[in-house]
Amino acid sequence: MRFGGMVGYLDVKRGNPLKKTKVLAVINQKGGVGKSTTVVNLSAALGEAKKKVLIVDLDPQGNTTSGYGIEKEELEYDIYDALLNDYPIEDLIMSTCEPNVFAVPATIQLAGAEVELVSLNNRETVLESVLLDIREYFDYVLIDCPPSLGLLTVNALVAADELLIPIQCEFYALEGVTKLLESMRMVKQRLNPDLDIFGVLLTMYDSRTTLSRQVAEEVQKYFGKKVFKQIIPRNVKLSEAPSHGLPVTQYAWLSKGSQAYTKLAREVIRRG
């Protein structure tokens, strides 16, 4: 099912620039924590709340791209071309099944970007420069970071206002978080002094297990008020939705997964 269609420069910039845009890097160096799931479903829920959202897929796996039904095999250009070939990002922006959500897609081509960025003088600030002219036309920009702390992730840290960190309620949940926070502090000192944590999101929570409850308590102790009150549960419909190229809010809007992301969107909006 293919929803993506090129939107174009004039459509993106239709209307007046918004007064304030929040750029959030959705990040965790561990894979399988619900990062792409969160980008897809939080963006959809924000869109349904009448917020204009741009998602930037910075993960070569392209799960956020396919999660919105965009056929990666049919794409001639992607975020790689904006980062390394000076391709205008406004010409990469695609429509999605949610009218208020737009996507800059990624394909496996992006896997080579880490090596190619090394040779650039401005290698850590390319994404920030690319987003500069269009960010103000959206309420939120959500960046799906790769599960690593390489140059693509550093670019996301520099471009972002704040970080949204998903942590799964499973064994070794906090493994690697210390390293992520060290990277954040380095970027904050050198390149992005205002960078901070917007929120920490508990995912894959199963209230039936002692482990989930213990991990939730541990994360709460570690991050305090940064932890969102809304927790994302383990949910079959949430797992099924990507194979249909739909956010769970459209695939199964009455499911627990859909309700959780809808409530999370409200909490995100309240935080400003």
Q: Residue spans of the language-model regions?
A:
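P-loop NTP-binding core
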Residues: M1-G272
